[in-house]
């Protein structure tokens, strides 16, 4: 009989043979976007701290002050004793930024998606998900126990065909997509999605984890569009931690009563809430700051003759896991931290470097990086 340890060892060995094994590397945060790997100070090209607000003096001070005043932890779930007054201030700011009636904050983006989708969708409903949407969206869809169909990435013709065929057979239909796709950096075709959802009486939900704070002067990828369910995170451009849903007041009230990942988990620490509030205030006060990550990414794509960046995320597709690991190691020799992204995070044959640019990524380093990346592009083209 195979023991648990034998089972684990065999599975790990199989991953290692395919160069898909993961290990944790201790990475100290310096002043964003700089990190420490051991004694080496490296420029991070893999961090989602797009506005560098996680190390901003104002957010740090807000977290320190709130922790000193209110303590380290929430002490309970939000529906019992963990609903600190700072939550109200945070949710008011989120709703204002996103242009909705209300907002609700979760413990993380993953918790938000696995709570929101099952709270809205029943087994006799239908979920249509972009095939490249984040893993937590697919996890949330699975928990709803409804029929789920993945449509080809950003293919509105295919989505329209599915809606035409499937809509009459289901009580409700939920279309879910990333606003900014986390591994490719491209944007969802928001206007077309809104039009299709209206035409077929479907609900549209977008995950704006990588759009809030950096697109449309910080409002995110859904700004100016009628998107009733705007989900996102506070852990990237906002620089803190947590997830949220911005929606109408009735929808938020329903989620508060039905989302298990909201009900049965402890509230966020007061220091985290205070830091997020301060970060949102900084975003609202400085539209120019929100534009800088995309401007940095566009500089890089111009220098490398890549397609114009649509977000702060620029993928360098290399194909094999071995090629991605080799490219990552090469950049590390030049003090650039660019993690290799391999299956199952991305489809087989599309291993890559996922480069991210922040407001404080130096232009001089972007120019140097472009010189290092160009030979990789020539190799893949050939």
Swiss-Prot record:
What InterPro entries has UniProt attached to this entry? Aminotrans_II_pyridoxalP_BS (IPR001917), Aminotransferase_I/II_large (IPR004839), AON_synthase_class-II (IPR050087), PyrdxlP-dep_Trfase (IPR015424), PyrdxlP-dep_Trfase_major (IPR015421), PyrdxlP-dep_Trfase_small (IPR015422)
Q: Binding residues for substrate, per the UniProt record?
A: 22, 29, 134, 345
- Enumerate the cofactors the protein uses: pyridoxal 5'-phosphate
Catalytic reaction annotation: 6-carboxyhexanoyl-[ACP] + L-alanine + H(+) = (8S)-8-amino-7-oxononanoate + holo-[ACP] + CO2
Give the matching PROSITE patterns: AA_TRANSFER_CLASS_2 (PS00599)
Which GO biological-process labels does this protein carry? biotin biosynthetic process
Q: Does the keyword Oxidoreductase apply?
A: no
Q: Which Pfam families match?
A: Aminotran_1_2 (PF00155)
The biological pathway it contributes to is: Cofactor biosynthesis; biotin biosynthesis
**Can you tell which superkingdom this protein's organism belongs to?**
Bacteria
**Which Gene Ontology molecular function entries are recorded, alphabetically?**
8-amino-7-oxononanoate synthase activity; pyridoxal phosphate binding
EC numbers, comma separated:
2.3.1.47
N6-(pyridoxal phosphate)lysine (modified residue): where?
236
Keywords, sorted A to Z: Acyltransferase, Biotin biosynthesis, Pyridoxal phosphate, Transferase
Instruction: Give residues annotated as binding pyridoxal 5'-phosphate.
Output: 109-110, 182, 207-210, 233-236
What family does the entry list?
Answer: Belongs to the class-II pyridoxal-phosphate-dependent aminotransferase family. BioF subfamily.
* Subunit organization: Homodimer.
What does this chain do? Catalyzes the decarboxylative condensation of pimeloyl-[acyl-carrier protein] and L-alanine to produce 8-amino-7-oxononanoate (AON), [acyl-carrier protein], and carbon dioxide.
Q: What is this protein called?
A: 8-amino-7-oxononanoate synthase
In the record, what lineage is assigned to the organism producing the protein?
Bacteria, Pseudomonadati, Pseudomonadota, Alphaproteobacteria, Acetobacterales
